[in-house]
Amino acid sequence: MTINIEYEAEEKLDLDYEKIITDVVNEAVDYEKCPYEAEVNVTIVDSESIHEINKEYRNIDSPTDVLSFPGVNYVTPSDFDAIEDELENNAEDYFNPDTGELLLGDIVLCVQKIKEQADKYGHSEKRELAFLTAHSMMHLFGYDHMTPEESAVMEAKQNEVLERLGITR
């Protein structure tokens, strides 16, 4: 498992963000029973940078807390059996040629939103960072929250990942 973490924001988080991100990513991969060694890229940026990325990729002209860019197109969330042929027949599109790891995708986190939302929701910055990472990992596994049913499934999964790590409000 490779987790590449880049911290590009000037404003710092006063916590061990690398450990928190690594623990959550590893737990999510284990929880979703990913059958491959995997790679995830995580970048921590400021509000201005995530605003630009959000505008460019989602046509939303405002900053956000986290953006997810899945590397795999699932038929059904986290159903690797359903896409096994696609992965094997197009390995160059899905696997890192140097490591052989499945490219699960990219996560972009906003440092200011982590701080603001931790304060707003009355919990620690550690919990907010862990929550946003778990949320984004579920997107990398193909889950979404466009309907109430999808939201309920995704929320239960991300909360279970956090509970397994002992990270609570």
UniProtKB/Swiss-Prot annotation:
Domain of life: Bacteria
A Pfam family it matches: YbeY
One Gene Ontology term, aspect cellular component: cytoplasm
Entry's Gene Ontology molecular function annotations: metalloendopeptidase activity; RNA endonuclease activity; zinc ion binding
Residues annotated for Zn(2+) binding in this entry: H135, H139, H145
GO biological process, one term: rRNA processing
EC number annotated for this UniProt entry: 3.1.-.-
Cell location: Cytoplasm
Record-annotated membrane-spanning stretches: none
Cross-referenced InterPro entries: MetalPrtase_cat_dom_sf_prd, YbeY
Cofactor-binding details, from the entry: Binds 1 zinc ion.
Main location group: cytoplasm
Keywords: Cytoplasm, Endonuclease, Hydrolase, Metal-binding, Nuclease, Ribosome biogenesis, rRNA processing, Zinc
Keyword Cytoplasm: yes
Cofactor or coenzyme needed: Zn(2+)
Enzyme category, top tier: hydrolase
Alphabetized Gene3D superfamilies for the sequence: Metalloproteases ('zincins'), catalytic domain
Cited PANTHER family: ENDORIBONUCLEASE YBEY, CHLOROPLASTIC
Family: Belongs to the endoribonuclease YbeY family.
Function as written in the Swiss-Prot or TrEMBL entry: Single strand-specific metallo-endoribonuclease involved in late-stage 70S ribosome quality control and in maturation of the 3' terminus of the 16S rRNA.
Protein name, as recorded: Endoribonuclease YbeY
Organism of provenance: Lachnospira eligens (strain ATCC 27750 / DSM 3376 / VPI C15-48 / C15-B4)
Originating gene: ybeY
